[in-house]
Every structure is written in structure tokens, then in C-alpha cells.
């Protein structure tokens, strides 16, 4: 644990006094082809733009600058795939060569500055190279999670209108191969917009059939470019305010929401975060156990670690089952990981399989300093279990696809603040976080309200949605004028610690009482036999809504589930009180989740309420929804 007094309050106050000076200073850590004319232009864009007049290139800052500075032989990426049985180390020098060559391939396929490229790929190094190659030539990448349903991919093709799609023959899941190419072919058949070309990486597990005239073999095309000395030697200078990428928010229905990330602000904020928030030094190994299809993968598998000159882990595997619940410990020990960033759901899975942490004893985690959790609410029992097992600080932090980096966290690099379980700690410099009521008035400490951020948002946050400025205003800015709406609800305590309790749509109204499902989940998760849980409001004729708790029991628990259900009901009554009207707990084998580990609460609610529902495109295993339906039926709920 860090014994130094934290510099956080001093640094945050400095940002408050002079936001432009603060970010102007941070911008000095980036290599610019032309320095920005100003730090911020409040008149540009929807709420202002960062670093106007600046000319830069994201790929240059992620790769070239490190090779130029003598870091070429350091590992940039370590690809570790228990699913493919492959490990590969890619140095900064090698990454530069591959990115230069793929940049030339993209140009030969007609991709120019400002053109869009969709990347529909598994967790392989070529996916990272693809993103960097787009950045190198000034193209805009849009990564779509590999294996995403064809219809969802088609809507993204129609929205982004890519010149080229980069894909692979397949992705790997435990015990099965996911064929990507048929999904891609179907998506292109469904979409109005047709890409000019597709570049397909043939993986050894499956060979995809190629469409003549449209599809190109990745390896052959790359090798041809290499042997003919085709490479984009220099990075294309782009404006700091030009888009780097579009990332569609998961689970959107109908017209997808394309979050735009710009080049300049993104580099400045992410580079700042590596040292100041995550406390990692250049040359150290950093591992974000996520997927490149999600924002965590974009920001902290690829861009931030590479901007900072770190070694980043690209892991194609799971927390459990590849081969066991010791998988994460093996990766940390083998590659000397200093900091791990993952979702709480991964640790709940490990805790369920190996509650006593027996597998941990097999590995030497001497270099491991910090565990960071984000992506969903981190329940205190999971945090406490991780602290007890790992004996390192376990830090919850909170952010969104839209922001690209932490809104709130515990800044390791500035000296840690005391941890309060259930809180992602405090607002990061750049974010003026307020808790407000429906009329945008700030509420008192410890009182629930909507969490908002006073405009302008800091560098790296979305300037807008792709070709949808009006939708940006409607979605995020209109409800609370002068603020960005996070759509999360929570409170701040007397020390300014932020507690994110639930999405605003997860606040349930029980007979006029506004109750947080997050608070109830915290209580259920404290039961010694509960591995994980979800609480949601279901329709009730008398009270409007009543809470219903779904609980997954730990491995090895052999008591009757009905007994544990009764204990859970009693526990909520004891800790929250009868006002919660919590009378329904249902033990289930597992909870339905998105591939990024978020529980599909909305879908469970629709099933429980007997409403019509559609299969979420992001679901990990559709069979689980049938199991939920059966469990509800057993309690006389859901569609009859």
C-alpha cells in the first residue's frame, strides 16, 4: 500500500483553477507535428473542442516515437492465447514494420484520409495492427466485436459506410469455433452500403471461402506488399480534432450510436492517465483483460499502454476454463504484469470456481502491484475477496464508452486515497461531477440523484456521435442543461467520494419509494453462499414495481436453494428494511451477460414481466435466457 500522502487534492485544485493550463501542460507529453493554436475552443463543436490547430498522428505516438527513442527492441505486445495454444511477442520495431506494410495494403485497396474501415476481428495481433495502420494513414477505424450478429454488423456498415472491412475466418471460444466469414457475408448482403473490399485473415482453425473480386487473403496481400517494399513510411498528419475512431455502443437497438473519438485529446488524456491514475511506468507490463471490441480494449489494451511505452498483453482466453481459475495468475506471473484491469464479473467467476484461492499458490506474482476493476458496479464482497487473495490494492474506477477514460478513480500515480468499498473514489481532473435532482439542482451529501458532469467534458471524451449532432444533444445534453448526463444514479458522501449505485433506469419505484437495485445487490452478494446476483424491478399491480433477486450459488454449495433464497430475503429485510418489499429471490445456475460481462438486466426484466423481448445481439450464451424463463415459471412469473 502506498504510504505517501496523496497529491490528488492539490492536482485536482490546480485543474479547477486553470483547466486550459493543466491540459496544455499534459499536451507537452505528446509529439505534435504542429502544436495546437489553443488548448480549448469553447465556440467550436457542440460544447467546444480540444487542441484546435494541433496537427498530430496517433500511430506515430503509439509506435514510431518509441522506436526513434531507442525502445524498438522492447516488447510492445505479448499475444497469449490459451484458446489457440499460441504465444507471440511483438517488439515496437516489429509493430512499426507491420503497421507500415498494412498501411500500404489499405492504401492499395483505396482507403484514404477520412475514409472508414470496419475491423471485425478476434483478439489477435493483426487486429491491433489494423487499428494502428488506419491511424497511420488518417483513416477512421470502427471495431465491431468479432462474432457480433450479422444484422448488428449490417447496421454498423450502413452507419459508418466503410471502404474496406478487415476480418478473420473465425474467433475462438472455449469448446467452439465461431465462424466469422458467414456472418460478414450475411451482413454485407443485408446492408445498403457495400464495402469495396474485404481483407480476411485465415486462421489455422478454419479456412474461409473468399468472394472473388471483393475478398483478399490477408497473409498473401501482406507478403506481396512486403516483398515489393510497399510501406507507408511516414505517418499522415491529421488535425487533433479529426476523428480517430467510431465505436458503437453495445446493446443499442435500431440506429446504432457511434461514439466518436478524436486524435489529439484522446492521446493527451490517455497518456496522462497511465502514470497518474494507473501508476505505471514506461517499460512495465500492463494488462487490460478485455476485448478490442469494447472501449476498455481500445483505450487500455492498445492506445494508452502504447502511448506510454509499456508492454501490453493481448489475451485470447477466459478467467476460468482456459484451462482453470488460475489462468489470470499464470499470465501475471509469466509476463511480469505490474497492473491488471478487468471487469468485476471476471473475479466473481474466479471466486466461484476457486473460493479459497488455492490455485494462486502455484504462481509468483512478485511484480504485480495493483488490480483495477471497471465496466460494471464492483460489489464489496468481490473487492474484499480480491484484496484478501492478492494482497494488493484493489481499485474500482468508473467510466463509460462515451468518456474513453476514467471519470472517477483512485489515482495510484498521485498517491492513493483511502479506499471505501462500493465507491470508485473521486472525480479525476477534467471532470466536475455533480449529483442533481430532476430540476438540475445539486442535492445534499449522501442523497441519491442523477450523476452529471459539468461541461465542457475533458479531452478524450466524445465530441459528438458519428454524423448525429442532434442525437448527441438529445441523448446526453438536453435533459440537464450545461451538463453531460451519465445516465447513472448515485450520491457523493461528505468526503466527496462518488457512489455509483445503478443506471438511472435501474432505480426502482416501490410504492413511491425510490430504491437502488445496486444497494440490494450489495446485500445479497454478502451472503456467504452467493457467487453473484442481479436485482431488478418487476411489475406489481399493487406497488408498481417490486424487487426480484436472481442469485447464483458458489461451486460446492450443497444446501437446498430454497433455504438460501429465504435467507437472502431475510438479509435484505434486515439490512435495508421492509420498505424494500423484497420477497422474491430465485436461485439460478447462471446469469445472462453480454460478451463484455455486463448482466442483461433489461432482458431479464422483460421475461419476468411477460413482455415481448428480442435476443440481445451482445449476449454471450442465449441458452441462459431459457433457464431464466424456466426459473421464473417455477415461481409463477413470466409469460404463462
Model-derived segments and spans:
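Conserved ATP/PPi-binding loop(s) of AMP-dependent carboxylate-activating enzymes
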Residues: 426-430, 441-476, 515-517, 612-613
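Conserved AMP-binding/adenylation subdomain of ANL enzymes
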Residues: 267-285, 295-339, 352-358
